[in-house]
Amino acid sequence: MRFTVWFLSGVALLGAAEWPQFRGAESNPISADTRLPDKWSATENVEWSTAVPGRGWSSPIVSKGRIFLTTVVTDGESKKPQTGTEYSNQYVAELQKQGLDEKEIMARVMARDFELPHEVNLRYFLYCLDLATGAVRWKREFHSGHPPGGRHRKNSFTSETPVTDGSAIYVYTGNVGLHAFDFDGKQLWRTPVEANPIYLEFGTAASPVLHGDRIFIVSDNQERQYAAAFDKRTGKQVWRANRDIGETTGSRMRSAWTTPYIWKNKVRTELVTVGPKTAISYDLEGKELWRLNGVAASPIPSPFATGGLLYLNGGRGKPLFAIRPGATGDITLGEGARSNVSIAWTERRSGVYLPTPVAYEGALYVLGETGIFSRIDAATGKLTYRARLDDNAGSFTVSPWAYNGRIFCLNEDGRTFVVAAGEEFQLLRTNDLDDFSMASPAIAGDRLLVRTESTLYSFRTRSAPK
């Protein structure tokens, strides 16, 4: 761990330093704290950096001066990630040119780009770090052994982000289970969940969400899709809603990786989920409220709401939807329609494969996995501009975040593109870390927490030396 001495000209507001779940409390990663840094590198504006053993793409969460994150340590070698989204497809094309049959091609792709359960023995850890220093307060091993399913080499075995209510940390790992710990690291309970196959052994990623006394999860897999609620005090299942969505013929793509969203709107509070080809919203007892067909077969971006509308990214080649509160039944758009009584607008070319958009200062900023960046009016759906961040922007998995009139886009190589908020595209600068990056950052008061493959960084605007 590296630690830099800082001069603090005041006390940070403790309440502003809470980041309780994936993408923050409102599932829209923005901040009004003007002290947050615009520039950083592995040496610039680094308050501290702490090496994190193993690998995990879960985001850090923050509560009461503590940071929590998960990781998996592998006995022996593990397949390292590789940037980009098309390299497996390119490999398939190369093998097809060699005249290999489909079975042999699939065997070679699985051997090169996937890690299967029998190939690895894992130890799953929850880490607690001190927010001010980065020092490890404690770590707890909560599971071990061969994983219940495989992963694509770009995924991790702990891609789900924990959630906290300020009293306990709730850790969900897809196909493994739920675990609860207090802030001193004492395990409160554990609840195993059934293991179901994921499409082509891609692995899992959908994080849990919390509302009141319940933890909500979604498991869209190849065999038994479901959404479920658990009592946060005991870990006991409260309800389960089985789902049957996605393709039933051909590729049978029935898996998804989206994190659900608790939408507290003027009509009611509901659990919004996005699965293969279909989005479904439930009330908090598991009763279906509405559904929308027309999303991608393998969705990854997560829904969120701001300004009275729910924003739902349909995925690559699909629309971006803005949904009004109070929807009921099937709200699918008719052929050629862009809106209806429940859907305020759609932007047909703005669905993307991986990153979730961010809403900031009246606009949605949409980042595609290849670096195409768009601004859309959040109220009307009007496209303001669409631009390429840079001719050599690289590939993007991390969702953008925003503060201080800037939008931040972190690519998989660790380079952040800083774009001015507003109606005209303006790239202000880039910040380089030179480390593989796929975890969405956390914002804690005046600190930006960025997790790379090897390290957790706390970036903070440097003050005058003491």
Task: Set out the residue ranges of the language-model regions.
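Hydrophobic h-region of N-terminal signal peptides that target proteins for export
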Residues: L8-A16
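Noncatalytic, solvent-exposed loop/strand surfaces
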Residues: A16-K466
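Sec-dependent signal peptide recognition
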Residues: M1-S9
